[in-house]
Amino acid sequence: MSHRSDTLPVPSGQRRGRVPRDHSIYTQLLEITLHLQQAMTEHFVQLTSRQGLSLEERRHTEAICEHEALLSRLICRMINLLQSGAASGLELQVPLPSEDSRGDVRYGQRAQLSGQPDPVPQLSDCEAAFVNRDLSIRGIDISVFYQSSFQDYNAYQKDKYHKDKNTLGFINLGTSENKLCMDLMTERLQESDMNCIEDTLLQYPDWRGQPFLREEVARFLTYYCRAPTRLDPENVVVLNGCCSVFCALAMVLCDPGEAFLVPAPFYGGFAFSSRLYAKVELIPVHLESEVTVTNTHPFQLTVDKLEEALLEARLEGKKVRGLVLINPQNPLGDIYSPDSLMKYLEFAKRYNLHVIIDEIYMLSVFDESITFHSILSMKSLPDSNRTHVIWGTSKDFGISGFRFGALYTHNKEVASAVSAFGYLHSISGITQHKLCQLLQNTEWIDKVYLPTNCYRLREAHKYITAELKALEIPFHNRSSGLYVWINLKKYLDPCTFEEERLLYCRFLDNKLLLSRGKTYMCKEPGWFCLIFADELPRLKLAMRRFCDVLQEQKEALIVKQLEDAMRE
């Protein structure tokens, strides 16, 4: 479409070739409105043409969602321009939507047309991003996506519980952090071998990671993953966190719009990481909680389910480039057996899929009768060139603030491409030195840290599960990871994702942060993830708040049932 502003008459007093700002804005607004009209027409054609296709209901729903997303972006641009016009003196304002703690949308008073526009109302961060004329459409998408993903976490960061300074602050049982061995880690990181500052540590590093750290990571993984042969440091790339590694892999293995299969429920941070830069879709392979003839245990992953998900994706025209596995699984805590892993790898090879395996919880197995089997322990892989392993220290060592993640891949091209992201996501030289010293002290890890960490995880898990049993709350009982997957369906009436969200908001209102199943792409509403790897006094207070919320919810359900009965 040509820009009408090119043909507008030039008012006297203005230089030829320049268009008044208000005319330019209205021209852009006209173009967007026409585009919006066209998109709405296509949207309703989709609705009409697919009404009778019951077998294509899912594709129908997804088509609607795509059109609604387009409409949302166009409306966003319109509001952007309208707000820009108001700020520059145009006689135009728009009532801005806001959302309360329950998620209900509120609108301001009707805009008034006047020569002196009313002051722009104070906006939340999310609203400000929505109307910020300085952001591109992509920038608005990123900002809104970030706010919607981390709004509650940011609230927690601003109002953290402290036993002396802030007893009414948020307690976070929603972010997977291990806070049980801070005393051990603080002591270890203050020892003399940690405090080294050399010239090379203050200079730009090898973007793949300092050679001394990559060598130590290769040795560490060879030892703890029980690799049959020594792992090659040249196959190691280190970045500032496992999500950075995953994001880099998504970028180099997929083009925008392509996809990975991921068994769901799965760690929600991967969805954020894959979308932020790479625009890669994660297609959930839904797992059911019910035991059936084909589902011999809850949330069982089978090759049949992978086959079905891949077929559905291809029928919808999606290009699937890989399979993502988390082992031990987050948030379920399941550990895949070597036989199961081999079946998943053979499935991937059959369809030329990459396999990304996140083993970030490999040392957080606290039941001595259970053995974790790393993919790196296998003598041969069906397709070693398409198998990529991620590990980091955030969970097993409880130092998420160090921001360290490592990739191990036999594929030299993948390693080289991921290394490019070290330019943006590298780790400071001093941190790399400390990490190297930490990982190479195998005696301290084996004799001091791991036994203590496993004992404390086991005791914290024992306390939490006893509390859940006393409350008669079902949960997925596993002995790895930092979390328990709990079933709160009985507190939802009806059992929907909207009711799940409202219960989540009730927890927030009582300064308790949990993670709800929807953020893990869980198929069934009512599941929550509860982190137990915290000090006992704080854990006990958190559980008191947890019980208070459930009592409030129970009373609210009784009132609702009575009101429904009276209406009948």
Swiss-Prot record:
Keyword terms: Pyridoxal phosphate
Pfam families: Aminotran_1_2
Biological process per Gene Ontology, one example term: biosynthetic process
Keyword Cell membrane assigned: no
Residue positions where N6-(pyridoxal phosphate)lysine is found in the record: 395
Gene Ontology MF terms: pyridoxal phosphate binding; transaminase activity
PANTHER family xrefs: BIFUNCTIONAL ASPARTATE AMINOTRANSFERASE AND GLUTAMATE/ASPARTATE-PREPHENATE AMINOTRANSFERASE-RELATED (PTHR43795), INACTIVE 1-AMINOCYCLOPROPANE-1-CARBOXYLATE SYNTHASE-LIKE PROTEIN 2-RELATED (PTHR43795:SF1)
Region Disordered, residue ranges: 1-21
InterPro entries hit by this protein: Aminotransferase_I/II_large (IPR004839), Ethylene_sulfur-biosynth (IPR050478), PyrdxlP-dep_Trfase (IPR015424), PyrdxlP-dep_Trfase_major (IPR015421), PyrdxlP-dep_Trfase_small (IPR015422)
Family: Belongs to the class-I pyridoxal-phosphate-dependent aminotransferase family.
This protein's name: Probable inactive 1-aminocyclopropane-1-carboxylate synthase-like protein 2
Source organism, top-level taxon: Eukaryota
Name of the gene this protein is made from: ACCSL
Signal peptide (residue range): none
Keyword Ion transport: no
